[in-house]
Amino acid sequence: MKKSLIALTLAALPVAAMADVTLYGTIKAGVETYRTVKHTDGKVTEVKTGSEIADFGSKIGFKGQEDFGNGLKAIWQLEQSASIAGTNSGWGNKQSFIGLKGGFGTVRAGNLNSILKSTGDNVNAWESGKATEDVLQVSKISAPEHRYASVRYDSPEFAGFSGSVQYAPKDNSGANGESYHVGLNYQNSGFFAQYAGLFQRHGEGTKATVGEPVEKLQVHRLVGGYDNDALYASVAVQQQDAKLAAAPNSHNSQTEVAATVAYRFGNVTPRVSYAHGFKGTVAKADGDNRYDQVVVGAEYDFSKRTSALVSAGWLQEGKGAGKTVSTASTVGLRHKF
Protein backbone atom coordinates (compact mmCIF):
# COMPACT_ATOMS: atom_id res chain seq x y z
CA MET A 1 0.00 0.00 0.00
CA LYS A 2 2.83 2.37 0.94
CA LYS A 3 4.63 1.58 -2.32
CA SER A 4 1.48 2.39 -4.29
CA LEU A 5 1.08 5.73 -2.52
CA ILE A 6 4.74 6.61 -3.11
CA ALA A 7 4.46 5.70 -6.79
CA LEU A 8 1.28 7.77 -7.14
CA THR A 9 2.93 10.76 -5.44
CA LEU A 10 6.01 10.58 -7.66
CA ALA A 11 3.84 10.34 -10.77
CA ALA A 12 1.94 13.46 -9.72
CA LEU A 13 5.06 15.59 -9.21
CA PRO A 14 5.58 16.54 -12.90
CA VAL A 15 1.88 17.44 -13.16
CA ALA A 16 2.16 19.72 -10.12
CA ALA A 17 5.23 21.38 -11.60
CA MET A 18 3.31 22.11 -14.82
CA ALA A 19 0.08 23.18 -13.09
CA ASP A 20 0.80 26.91 -13.48
CA VAL A 21 1.78 26.74 -17.16
CA THR A 22 -0.96 27.47 -19.69
CA LEU A 23 -0.99 26.85 -23.43
CA TYR A 24 -3.27 29.29 -25.25
CA GLY A 25 -3.81 30.75 -28.68
CA THR A 26 -6.10 31.90 -31.46
CA ILE A 27 -6.47 30.54 -34.98
CA LYS A 28 -8.29 32.91 -37.33
CA ALA A 29 -8.43 33.24 -41.10
CA GLY A 30 -10.80 33.90 -43.98
CA VAL A 31 -11.43 34.72 -47.62
CA GLU A 32 -10.95 38.37 -48.63
CA THR A 33 -11.67 40.47 -51.69
CA TYR A 34 -10.52 44.05 -52.26
CA ARG A 35 -10.57 46.86 -54.83
CA THR A 36 -8.72 50.20 -54.92
CA VAL A 37 -9.39 53.01 -57.39
CA LYS A 38 -6.91 55.91 -57.58
CA HIS A 39 -7.82 59.26 -59.15
CA THR A 40 -5.48 61.92 -60.54
CA ASP A 41 -6.87 65.26 -61.74
CA GLY A 42 -10.35 63.79 -61.58
CA LYS A 43 -9.55 60.79 -63.77
CA VAL A 44 -9.12 57.14 -62.82
CA THR A 45 -5.42 56.37 -63.21
CA GLU A 46 -5.06 53.06 -61.39
CA VAL A 47 -7.33 50.17 -60.39
CA LYS A 48 -6.23 47.25 -58.24
CA THR A 49 -8.39 44.23 -57.41
CA GLY A 50 -7.67 40.95 -55.74
CA SER A 51 -8.77 38.11 -53.50
CA GLU A 52 -6.88 35.79 -51.18
CA ILE A 53 -6.97 33.34 -48.31
CA ALA A 54 -5.58 35.39 -45.43
CA ASP A 55 -4.51 34.77 -41.88
CA PHE A 56 -6.00 37.31 -39.46
CA GLY A 57 -3.16 37.30 -36.92
CA SER A 58 -3.21 33.79 -35.45
CA LYS A 59 -0.99 33.23 -32.44
CA ILE A 60 0.12 30.61 -29.94
CA GLY A 61 1.59 31.22 -26.52
CA PHE A 62 2.71 29.82 -23.21
CA LYS A 63 2.30 31.63 -19.90
CA GLY A 64 2.80 30.78 -16.29
CA GLN A 65 3.44 31.96 -12.77
CA GLU A 66 5.13 30.94 -9.54
CA ASP A 67 3.55 31.93 -6.22
CA PHE A 68 6.10 33.06 -3.62
CA GLY A 69 3.46 33.69 -0.96
CA ASN A 70 2.26 36.95 0.61
CA GLY A 71 0.67 37.91 -2.71
CA LEU A 72 3.95 38.02 -4.64
CA LYS A 73 4.22 36.07 -7.91
CA ALA A 74 6.71 35.64 -10.72
CA ILE A 75 4.93 35.83 -14.09
CA TRP A 76 6.09 35.05 -17.62
CA GLN A 77 4.73 34.73 -21.15
CA LEU A 78 6.16 33.62 -24.50
CA GLU A 79 3.88 34.43 -27.45
CA GLN A 80 4.43 34.19 -31.19
CA SER A 81 2.60 34.51 -34.49
CA ALA A 82 1.31 31.25 -35.95
CA SER A 83 -0.06 32.06 -39.40
CA ILE A 84 -1.98 29.25 -41.08
CA ALA A 85 -0.94 30.90 -44.35
CA GLY A 86 2.72 30.22 -43.52
CA THR A 87 3.70 33.88 -43.40
CA ASN A 88 5.14 34.11 -39.87
CA SER A 89 8.11 32.54 -38.12
CA GLY A 90 10.20 32.93 -34.98
CA TRP A 91 9.65 32.72 -31.25
CA GLY A 92 8.59 35.55 -28.99
CA ASN A 93 7.66 37.85 -31.88
CA LYS A 94 4.45 38.90 -30.12
CA GLN A 95 4.03 40.02 -26.51
CA SER A 96 6.58 38.11 -24.40
CA PHE A 97 7.95 38.99 -20.97
CA ILE A 98 9.04 38.04 -17.47
CA GLY A 99 8.13 39.98 -14.34
CA LEU A 100 6.76 40.26 -10.82
CA LYS A 101 3.17 40.84 -9.67
CA GLY A 102 1.97 41.76 -6.20
CA GLY A 103 0.11 44.29 -4.12
CA PHE A 104 2.38 47.00 -5.52
CA GLY A 105 1.23 46.29 -9.08
CA THR A 106 2.97 44.55 -11.98
CA VAL A 107 6.49 45.05 -13.34
CA ARG A 108 7.48 43.36 -16.62
CA ALA A 109 10.42 43.40 -19.00
CA GLY A 110 10.43 42.03 -22.55
CA ASN A 111 8.74 42.55 -25.91
CA LEU A 112 5.74 44.44 -24.55
CA ASN A 113 2.69 46.13 -26.01
CA SER A 114 3.02 49.88 -25.70
CA ILE A 115 0.51 51.61 -23.43
CA LEU A 116 -1.00 53.10 -26.59
CA LYS A 117 -1.43 49.59 -28.03
CA SER A 118 -3.09 48.45 -24.79
CA THR A 119 -6.00 50.81 -25.58
CA GLY A 120 -6.29 49.35 -29.08
CA ASP A 121 -9.14 46.92 -28.37
CA ASN A 122 -11.38 49.92 -27.70
CA VAL A 123 -10.31 51.59 -30.96
CA ASN A 124 -10.14 48.73 -33.45
CA ALA A 125 -12.30 45.64 -32.85
CA TRP A 126 -12.03 44.17 -36.36
CA GLU A 127 -10.23 41.16 -37.90
CA SER A 128 -8.60 40.95 -41.34
CA GLY A 129 -5.44 40.03 -43.21
CA LYS A 130 -2.54 42.35 -43.98
CA ALA A 131 -3.66 43.20 -47.52
CA THR A 132 -6.99 44.65 -46.36
CA GLU A 133 -6.23 45.99 -42.89
CA ASP A 134 -6.39 49.63 -44.04
CA VAL A 135 -9.99 49.09 -45.16
CA LEU A 136 -11.40 46.34 -42.91
CA GLN A 137 -9.77 47.55 -39.69
CA VAL A 138 -9.70 50.96 -38.03
CA SER A 139 -5.98 50.87 -38.68
CA LYS A 140 -4.98 54.41 -39.65
CA ILE A 141 -5.61 55.78 -36.17
CA SER A 142 -3.97 52.59 -34.85
CA ALA A 143 -0.73 53.11 -36.82
CA PRO A 144 1.33 54.38 -33.81
CA GLU A 145 0.60 51.17 -31.84
CA HIS A 146 3.73 49.02 -31.52
CA ARG A 147 5.53 46.58 -29.28
CA TYR A 148 8.83 47.62 -27.74
CA ALA A 149 11.70 45.85 -26.02
CA SER A 150 10.97 47.70 -22.81
CA VAL A 151 10.19 47.70 -19.10
CA ARG A 152 6.65 48.51 -17.98
CA TYR A 153 4.89 49.13 -14.66
CA ASP A 154 1.10 48.83 -14.22
CA SER A 155 -0.38 50.00 -10.92
CA PRO A 156 -3.16 48.27 -9.00
CA GLU A 157 -6.63 49.76 -9.25
CA PHE A 158 -7.69 52.40 -6.71
CA ALA A 159 -11.37 53.46 -6.72
CA GLY A 160 -11.59 52.60 -10.42
CA PHE A 161 -8.34 54.36 -11.37
CA SER A 162 -5.10 52.73 -12.52
CA GLY A 163 -1.96 53.96 -14.26
CA SER A 164 0.98 52.73 -16.32
CA VAL A 165 4.48 53.90 -17.26
CA GLN A 166 6.84 52.32 -19.80
CA TYR A 167 10.38 52.93 -21.04
CA ALA A 168 12.10 51.53 -24.16
CA PRO A 169 15.89 52.09 -24.18
CA LYS A 170 17.54 53.47 -27.29
CA ASP A 171 19.76 50.43 -27.82
CA ASN A 172 16.73 48.13 -27.99
CA SER A 173 14.72 50.33 -30.33
CA GLY A 174 16.93 50.47 -33.41
CA ALA A 175 16.34 53.51 -35.59
CA ASN A 176 13.32 54.54 -33.51
CA GLY A 177 15.41 55.70 -30.54
CA GLU A 178 14.32 55.61 -26.92
CA SER A 179 10.68 56.19 -26.08
CA TYR A 180 8.56 57.01 -23.04
CA HIS A 181 4.95 55.95 -22.49
CA VAL A 182 2.30 56.90 -19.92
CA GLY A 183 -1.30 55.86 -19.36
CA LEU A 184 -4.27 56.48 -17.07
CA ASN A 185 -7.43 54.37 -16.90
CA TYR A 186 -10.80 54.63 -15.16
CA GLN A 187 -13.73 52.21 -15.08
CA ASN A 188 -16.97 52.12 -13.13
CA SER A 189 -20.26 50.26 -13.71
CA GLY A 190 -19.49 49.54 -17.36
CA PHE A 191 -18.22 53.04 -18.19
CA PHE A 192 -14.54 53.44 -19.02
CA ALA A 193 -12.04 56.15 -19.94
CA GLN A 194 -8.41 55.84 -21.04
CA TYR A 195 -5.52 58.17 -21.81
CA ALA A 196 -2.32 57.00 -23.49
CA GLY A 197 0.71 59.06 -24.45
CA LEU A 198 3.84 58.26 -26.46
CA PHE A 199 6.97 60.45 -26.49
CA GLN A 200 9.85 59.54 -28.81
CA ARG A 201 12.83 61.81 -29.46
CA HIS A 202 13.96 60.15 -32.70
CA GLY A 203 11.70 58.05 -34.89
CA GLU A 204 10.16 57.55 -38.28
CA GLY A 205 6.75 58.73 -37.12
CA THR A 206 3.48 57.54 -38.57
CA LYS A 207 2.73 60.48 -40.86
CA ALA A 208 6.30 60.86 -42.13
CA THR A 209 7.20 62.00 -45.61
CA VAL A 210 9.25 59.39 -47.47
CA GLY A 211 12.97 60.10 -47.10
CA GLU A 212 12.48 62.72 -44.37
CA PRO A 213 13.14 61.28 -40.88
CA VAL A 214 11.36 62.90 -37.96
CA GLU A 215 12.08 63.60 -34.32
CA LYS A 216 10.20 64.67 -31.19
CA LEU A 217 7.26 62.42 -31.99
CA GLN A 218 4.26 62.80 -29.68
CA VAL A 219 1.01 60.84 -29.76
CA HIS A 220 -1.88 61.54 -27.38
CA ARG A 221 -5.03 59.41 -27.32
CA LEU A 222 -8.27 59.68 -25.32
CA VAL A 223 -10.79 56.83 -25.35
CA GLY A 224 -14.15 56.67 -23.60
CA GLY A 225 -17.16 54.43 -23.74
CA TYR A 226 -19.53 51.91 -22.21
CA ASP A 227 -19.33 48.12 -22.17
CA ASN A 228 -21.76 45.65 -20.61
CA ASP A 229 -22.96 42.17 -21.56
CA ALA A 230 -24.92 43.39 -24.60
CA LEU A 231 -24.15 47.00 -25.55
CA TYR A 232 -20.70 48.30 -26.46
CA ALA A 233 -19.91 51.87 -27.54
CA SER A 234 -16.60 53.74 -27.71
CA VAL A 235 -15.18 57.01 -29.04
CA ALA A 236 -11.46 57.73 -29.54
CA VAL A 237 -9.66 61.01 -30.27
CA GLN A 238 -5.97 61.07 -31.21
CA GLN A 239 -3.47 63.83 -31.93
CA GLN A 240 0.04 63.18 -33.19
CA ASP A 241 2.84 65.52 -34.14
CA ALA A 242 6.49 65.15 -35.18
CA LYS A 243 9.19 67.55 -36.31
CA LEU A 244 11.06 66.90 -39.55
CA ALA A 245 14.70 66.35 -38.54
CA ALA A 246 16.18 68.19 -41.55
CA ALA A 247 13.72 71.07 -41.75
CA PRO A 248 13.48 73.69 -38.96
CA ASN A 249 10.00 74.70 -37.79
CA SER A 250 8.29 72.00 -39.86
CA HIS A 251 5.89 69.39 -38.59
CA ASN A 252 3.90 66.36 -39.57
CA SER A 253 0.67 66.39 -37.59
CA GLN A 254 -2.89 65.14 -37.72
CA THR A 255 -5.98 64.76 -35.54
CA GLU A 256 -8.09 61.61 -35.91
CA VAL A 257 -11.33 60.32 -34.41
CA ALA A 258 -13.01 56.91 -34.39
CA ALA A 259 -16.27 55.51 -32.99
CA THR A 260 -17.65 51.98 -32.68
CA VAL A 261 -21.06 50.64 -31.63
CA ALA A 262 -22.01 46.97 -31.18
CA TYR A 263 -24.99 45.15 -29.68
CA ARG A 264 -25.31 41.46 -28.90
CA PHE A 265 -28.52 39.64 -29.92
CA GLY A 266 -28.20 36.08 -28.64
CA ASN A 267 -25.30 34.54 -30.57
CA VAL A 268 -25.06 37.41 -33.09
CA THR A 269 -23.16 40.67 -32.52
CA PRO A 270 -23.51 43.27 -35.30
CA ARG A 271 -20.97 46.11 -35.23
CA VAL A 272 -20.28 49.37 -37.06
CA SER A 273 -17.26 51.71 -36.92
CA TYR A 274 -16.55 55.13 -38.39
CA ALA A 275 -13.15 56.86 -38.51
CA HIS A 276 -12.12 60.28 -39.79
CA GLY A 277 -8.74 61.90 -40.26
CA PHE A 278 -8.80 65.69 -40.33
CA LYS A 279 -6.66 67.68 -42.74
CA GLY A 280 -3.22 67.85 -41.18
CA THR A 281 0.23 69.24 -41.85
CA VAL A 282 2.82 67.43 -43.96
CA ALA A 283 6.28 69.06 -43.96
CA LYS A 284 5.65 72.83 -44.01
CA ALA A 285 2.34 72.84 -45.84
CA ASP A 286 -1.22 71.69 -45.36
CA GLY A 287 -1.37 68.06 -46.42
CA ASP A 288 -4.31 66.31 -48.00
CA ASN A 289 -4.05 63.38 -45.62
CA ARG A 290 -7.74 63.49 -44.78
CA TYR A 291 -9.69 60.27 -44.83
CA ASP A 292 -13.12 58.83 -44.07
CA GLN A 293 -13.78 55.18 -43.28
CA VAL A 294 -16.77 52.96 -42.51
CA VAL A 295 -16.63 49.30 -41.46
CA VAL A 296 -19.74 47.16 -40.88
CA GLY A 297 -19.97 43.51 -39.94
CA ALA A 298 -21.11 40.88 -37.50
CA GLU A 299 -19.90 37.90 -35.50
CA TYR A 300 -21.84 34.69 -34.90
CA ASP A 301 -20.74 32.61 -31.91
CA PHE A 302 -21.02 28.86 -32.43
CA SER A 303 -19.63 28.47 -28.91
CA LYS A 304 -17.56 30.41 -26.38
CA ARG A 305 -14.45 29.60 -28.42
CA THR A 306 -15.50 29.53 -32.08
CA SER A 307 -17.03 32.40 -34.08
CA ALA A 308 -17.86 33.16 -37.70
CA LEU A 309 -16.84 36.62 -38.94
CA VAL A 310 -18.18 38.74 -41.78
CA SER A 311 -17.36 42.38 -42.56
CA ALA A 312 -17.15 44.99 -45.32
CA GLY A 313 -15.26 48.27 -45.40
CA TRP A 314 -15.02 51.51 -47.38
CA LEU A 315 -12.11 53.97 -47.20
CA GLN A 316 -11.64 57.28 -49.00
CA GLU A 317 -8.26 58.99 -48.74
CA GLY A 318 -7.94 62.57 -49.90
CA LYS A 319 -10.69 64.67 -51.46
CA GLY A 320 -11.85 65.76 -54.87
CA ALA A 321 -9.80 65.12 -58.00
CA GLY A 322 -6.96 63.30 -56.23
CA LYS A 323 -8.88 60.91 -54.00
CA THR A 324 -8.28 57.18 -53.62
CA VAL A 325 -11.27 54.94 -52.81
CA SER A 326 -10.86 51.39 -51.49
CA THR A 327 -13.42 48.71 -50.65
CA ALA A 328 -12.99 45.24 -49.19
CA SER A 329 -14.96 42.37 -47.68
CA THR A 330 -14.19 39.17 -45.82
CA VAL A 331 -15.76 36.01 -44.44
CA GLY A 332 -13.77 34.13 -41.83
CA LEU A 333 -13.61 31.85 -38.82
CA ARG A 334 -11.93 32.29 -35.42
CA HIS A 335 -11.18 29.69 -32.74
CA LYS A 336 -9.66 30.41 -29.33
CA PHE A 337 -8.00 27.80 -27.14
Swiss-Prot record:
Bilayer-crossing residues are none
InterPro entries membership: Gram-neg_bact_OMP (IPR050298), Gram_neg_porin_domain (IPR033900), Porin_dom_sf (IPR023614), Porin_Gram-ve (IPR001702), Porin_Gram-ve_CS (IPR013793), Porin_Neis (IPR002299)
Give the highest taxon in the source lineage: Bacteria
Q: What is this protein called?
A: Major outer membrane protein P.IB
What are this entry's molecular-function GO terms? Answer: porin activity
* UniProt similarity note: Belongs to the Gram-negative porin family.
Q: What does this protein do?
A: Serves as a slightly cation selective porin.
Gene source species: Neisseria lactamica
Q: For this UniProt entry, what's an example GO CC term? A: pore complex
Matches recorded under PANTHER family: MAJOR OUTER MEMBRANE PROTEIN P.IA, PROTEIN YDDL-RELATED
Q: Which UniProt keywords apply?
A: Cell outer membrane, Ion transport, Membrane, Porin, Signal, Transmembrane, Transmembrane beta strand, Transport
Mind telling me which Pfam families this protein's record contains?
Answer: Porin_1
- Membrane as a keyword? yes
Could you give the subunit structure recorded for this chain? Homotrimer.
Instruction: Report how it sits in the membrane.
Output: Multi-pass membrane protein
Annotated compartments: Cell outer membrane
Instruction: Tell me if Cell inner membrane is a UniProt keyword of this record.
Output: no
Signal peptide annotation: 1-19
Tell me which Gene Ontology terms the entry assigns under biological process.
monoatomic ion transmembrane transport
Gene behind the chain: por
